[in-house]
Amino acid sequence: FCIIRSLQQSSDRAKEKKVQEMCKIGKVYVIGLGPGAEKEMTYQASTALEKSEVVIGYTVYTGLIRERFPDKKYLSTPMRQEVVRCEMAMDEAMKGRTVAMVCSGDAGIYGMAGLLYEMGQGYPEVELEVVPGITAANGGAAVLGAPLMHDFAVISLSDLLTPWEKIEKRIRGAAMADFVICLYNPSSRKRADYLKKACEYILEYQSPDTVCGYVRNIGREGEDAHILTLSELKDTEVDMFTTVYIGNS
C-alpha cells in the first residue's frame, strides 16, 4: 500500500510540474546594443543576451551579435517589419521562452521599446524589461570631442512615422532656441535632400560659420568623422548610417 501511494504521489508531482511548465510565461528584454562595436555594448545588455534563448531583431542588428552569442535561436526581419518583430517576440514569450529584442543604440530612443510596450498591453502576462544602450548621439559626440556639453535637441529626419511639416517645425524651433542639434537618419535614397533642407532652415537663425560635425558608422568598421561649417554641411552627402551635429552660438 505504501509503495502504491508513493508511486501515486510521484506521478501527481510529475503532472503538477508539467502543468507548471506549460503555464510558464516568458520574458522579453528590449536591448539597446549601442553603436555597434562589442566594446560599446553595456554589461547589462550583454548579461540580458546571455540569459535569453531567442534573439529577435532587424537583420543587420542580429548580424552584429551572432558570432558572440552563437547558441541562441535567431529570428530576423527586414526593415519596416517592426510590428511583425514585436508579434514574434510576444509569441516566443508566450511559449515560456526568454526573448531578447535587439535594437541599435538605445531601445528607448527611436528603438523598439515604445512599440513593444504598446503591443504588450495585449499580453499582460509577459514581463517586459528595457535594457539601455549607448545611443548614436553619445557615441558620435565622443568621437568628435564634446559637442553636447549643454542643452541640445535630438531630431530624426525620417518622415516614415512623422510628417515632414512637423519635423520642419521642430528644426526651426530648436534653431531659434539656439540648441545644439543632433540629427538622426539624415538621408536615404528617397530623402536625399532632407539634410540640405534642414540646414537651410537652421541658416535662417544661425551663422554659416557655425561649427558642425558628422560621424558615419559610429563604433563600427569604417568609422569616419568630419568637422565643418554649417554652410559646408548643407552641400554634404551623407547616408542613414551617419549622425550629424550642428553647433550653436
Predicted region positions:
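A short acidic, often aromatic-flanked loop/helix-cap motif at beta-alpha or helix-coil junctions
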Residues: R80-R85, A136, L160-T162, G219-G222
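Class I SAM-dependent methyltransferase SAM-binding "motif I" and its flanking Rossmann-like core
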Residues: I109-A177
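Cationic, low-complexity basic patches in intrinsically disordered or flexible, solvent-exposed regions
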Residues: Q9-S10
